[in-house]
Amino acid sequence: TPVSRETMDRCPGIRLIAVMATGYNIVDYTYAREKGIPVVNVPSYGTQIVGQYAVSLLLEICSHIGYHSETVKAGKWEKNPDWCYWDHPMIELYGKTAGIVGLGRIGQATAKILNALNMKVIAYDAHQSPQGAELAEYVDLDTLWARSDVIFLHCPLFPETQGIINRDTIEKMKDGV
């Protein structure tokens, strides 16, 4: 349930807003701060699984795992004239560059997995940390758009980040990113 300015005004005794998730973009954070109401979240909730899921989606796009699983079950491999069955070109991730926008907990979890795949990891984050610097090379956004073969968005949805992928940023990206 969103916690808007109106909601806070209807609850004059509110002393704390605790969001049971990783982000708090459902809260009018600026207004809460103006009223002196702390806003907290559960920062480590889902960290590892979200990173794992993000990379799983990339692996599906690159390897067509679901499609190949279904076609093997349907007998296409058996009907293949040679021992090698694949029905779509696959994309090898080794040596490719992954760009991560937002290198907080989830971005770092994602970076660890991408590093294990021997990908070059670059990242943009307004709040650079030593932990993040061990996992990725910090770059500005224009560099990230230009150098990345794949891009992950692990940033909160704020007015500054809404629409971050748009015509202008897409024009700065490699073809096929």
Model-derived segments and their meaning:
Residues I26-Y31, Y67-N80, M119, Q128:
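Mobile beta-alpha loop/short-helix "lid" or hinge segments that flank ligand
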Residues P43-T97:
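Phosphate-binding beta-alpha-beta segment of Rossmann-like dinucleotide-binding domains, i.e.
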Residues T1-V40, A146, N166:
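An N-terminal-biased, well-structured beta-alpha scaffold segment characteristic
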Residues P2, G23, N41, Y45-I49, ...:
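Residue-level detector of alpha-helix initiation sites
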Residues A21-N25, S44-T47, H127, L144:
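Short, acidic/turn-prone active-site loops that include or flank metal/cofactor-
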Residues P38, E60, K120:
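Residue-level detector of anion-binding/catalytic polar loops
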Residues Y85-D175:
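Rossmann-like dinucleotide/phosphate-binding beta-alpha-beta segment
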Residues R33-Y45, K174-V177:
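Rossmann-fold dehydrogenase core element
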